[in-house]
């Protein structure tokens, strides 16, 4: 800017256009993108080989390891290649957030609840900085040591990496599901924001690959009946169409629903598919 300051914003690919619009609204047009792509297959496999690790069996886990954050945690927290994505996320959570192996069970619970409270406070208030009030000091101190939480002077704390926030949201969504075990009640318990939508996509994609089609059908049928928030309709469709287990089943089982009302639902599905393909095209740069 005019004072000589240079600002670096780290953003996700799917937020790029939103941030661009916000900057342009403030007449801040002198900016450039520095794209940091995910690892390609060869780069990932070379790193695994150098660390004497084999390629993981589970496709969803292999996909996540193209992200350097998850790859580092994979090398740090796991030893087996025969591990699912859910098990991998649980290991990161248990070791880094809960402090499994160094904390007793009571302190593990305190650390977990403290971090979940921080995530919920940040999302509810919409502020980057989380106030220090009502947080367990010892738990926060341990989270700082792990590099999960950082200190912002005298004002409070912030979460050092948003992928830890994602893990927390998936954990919270899973708890809502186990608490309700009813698809309609489950969706009524989900907040209407993009962070929860993204976390739901991750949670639901794993569910589609690991559970029976009967459970997937419950979610799809509820979608056709109607959901409180449109964003979760989009999330269900995108997850189902990208699922190796459920994509073909969806079109065969629900062909009538897709054709009803002058192909209303089919048009919606195709629109969501088109948007997803556009995002994928801009996302895969290697």
Give each language-model segment a name.
Residues 1:
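Conserved nucleotide-sensing/catalytic segment adjacent to the nucleotide-binding pocket
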Residues 67-71, 161:
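Short, conserved phosphate/pyrophosphate- and ester-handling motifs at nucleotide-, phospho-/glycolipid
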């Amino acid at each position: 800017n005019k004072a000589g300051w240079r600002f670096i914003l780290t953003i996700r690919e799917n937020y790029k256009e939103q941030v661009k619009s916000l900057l342009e609204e403030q007449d801040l047009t002198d900016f450039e993108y520095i794209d940091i792509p995910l690892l390609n297959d060869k780069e990932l496999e070379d790193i695994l080989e150098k660390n004497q690790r084999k390629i993981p069996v589970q496709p969803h886990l292999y996909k996540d390891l193209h992200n350097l954050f998850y790859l580092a945690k994979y090398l740090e927290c796991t030893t087996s290649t025969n591990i699912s994505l859910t098990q991998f996320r649980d290991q990161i959570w248990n070791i880094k957030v809960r402090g499994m192996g160094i904390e007793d069970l009571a302190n593990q619970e305190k650390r977990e609840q403290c971090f979940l409270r921080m995530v919920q406070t940040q999302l509810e208030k919409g502020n980057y900085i989380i106030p220090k009030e009502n947080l367990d000091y010892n738990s926060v101190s341990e989270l700082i040591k792990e590099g999960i939480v950082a200190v912002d002077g005298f004002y409070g704390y912030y979460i050092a990496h948003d992928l830890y926030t994602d893990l927390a949201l998936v954990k919270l969504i899973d708890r809502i599901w186990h608490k309700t075990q009813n698809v309609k009640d489950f969706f009524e318990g989900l907040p209407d924001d993009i962070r929860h939508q993204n976390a739901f996509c991750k949670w639901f994609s794993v569910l589609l690959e690991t559970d029976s089609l009967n459970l997937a059908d419950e979610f799809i049928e509820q979608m056709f009946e109607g959901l409180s928030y449109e964003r979760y309709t989009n999330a269900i469709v995108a997850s189902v169409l990208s699922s190796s287990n459920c994509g073909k089943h969806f079109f065969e089982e629900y062909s009538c629903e897709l054709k009803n009302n002058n192909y209303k639902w089919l048009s919606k599905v195709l629109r969501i598919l088109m948007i997803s393909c556009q995002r994928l095209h801009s996302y895969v740069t290697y």
